Amino acid sequence: MFALVDCNSFYASCERIFRPDLRTKPVVVLSNNDGCVVALTKEAKNLGIKMCDPWFKIEKTFKQKGGIAFSSNYELYGDISSRIMSILEELAPKVEIYSIDEAFLDLTGIANCMDLEEFGRVCQKQIMQYTGMPVRVGIGPTKTLAKVASYGAKRYPTTQGVLDVTALHKRIKLMKLMPVNEIWGVGRRLNKRLLSQRVSTAFNLSQMDIGQVRKQFSIMLVNTIRELR
């Protein structure tokens, strides 16, 4: 059993930690030399800002609408990331750091002690209390399903940022709503090939014939399908 702990809009949230007045404001973080947008909050997304937008093209309009931009500060982001990972290492027996803002937790033994959704909320609370960073937690029997759960935790506000898809009916319901290109490891080219075979959702992918997939695609996709089942 695994949990994926993923920080919400990590770079932008790091900046907000020291500027609580920006909690509901549109915020973007810019690349080196302020070239383009590398992180943005949902409020910025609601203004039509997108990842990699050139700053010189959007600066005037963004500021007119009350947006705030920060130059990237990777030393700060690394420090906050280290603090978050240290908290997780106190909560779970094994932590695999996947990126600066994501980590997989091995939940072996934890399910015997407490409800897994409750554990996810403990992670949320501890990280918010000690760092000020909002996170979401996806829980599932495999790492790929933990990623699926994280997608659901982000997509659906009723989850309040924590979703456990251990129960088969829960993950089937979610996978039927999840576009196949949202699956971990499905890039643009693979998505196009899958769509050509009418595989448009995560559930469709999970039902593909393993033998045919091995012949037409790759062992990596075979492994992904196995992790979805």
Describe the residue ranges of each PLM region.
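Gly/Gly-Pro- and Ser/Thr-rich, intrinsically disordered tail segments characteristic of DNA damage-repair
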Residues: 1-226
